[in-house]
């Protein structure tokens, strides 16, 4: 199954690694592909893909929203609301997280 994870913070990276370990195809969506943590994650998970939020939402048959609650709406807008239609969305946001 193709899983797109929107958000490259600790929650997104841990979930992406776990899904990869179960044999799933994973794309980690980030606003900053050159971020040190993201590059380290990619080195440790060479089968994982990196992309923009929009690339990730298009890629995933399942979409995991793993961003802070205060930026969730912006992340969905950047991903393109149309890419969420008829897909399973797992929302891990926390309304008090930045």
Segments (PLM) and residue ranges:
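NAD(P)+-binding Rossmann beta1-loop-alpha1 motif at the extreme N-terminus of oxidoreductases
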Residues: 1-40
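Rossmann-like NAD(P)-binding element
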Residues: 44-48, 52-90, 94-98
């Amino acid at each position: 199954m193709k899983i797109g994870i929107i958000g490259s913070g600790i929650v997104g990276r841990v979930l992406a690694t776990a899904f990869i370990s179960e044999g799933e195809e994973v794309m980690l969506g980030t606003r900053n592909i050159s971020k040190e943590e993201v590059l380290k994650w990619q080195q440790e998970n060479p089968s994982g893909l990196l992309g923009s939020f929009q690339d990730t939402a298009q890629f995933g048959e399942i979409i995991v929203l793993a961003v802070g609650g205060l930026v969730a709406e912006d992340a969905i807008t950047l991903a393109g609301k149309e890419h969420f239609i008829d897909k399973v969305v797992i929302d891990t946001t926390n309304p008090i997280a930045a």
